[in-house]
From Swiss-Prot:
Entry GO CC: extracellular region
Function: Has antibacterial activity against Gram-positive and Gram-negative bacteria including Salmonella, B.cereus, B.megaterium, L.casei, L.viridescens, M.flavus, C.glutamicum, C.crenatum, L.mesenteroides, E.faecalis, S.flexneri, S.aureus and B.thuringiensis.
GO process terms (BP): defense response to bacterium; killing of cells of another organism
Cell compartment(s), UniProt: Secreted
Origin: domain of life: Bacteria
Keywords of the record: Antibiotic, Antimicrobial, Bacteriocin, Secreted
Quaternary context: Monomer.
Organism: Bacillus subtilis
Protein name per the record: Subpeptin JM4-B
């Protein structure tokens, strides 16, 4: 989880 990179890896 992380939104550090916009929402490319939308692994909330």
């Amino acid at each position: 989880x992380x939104k550090e990179i916009x929402h490319i890896f939308h692994d909330n």
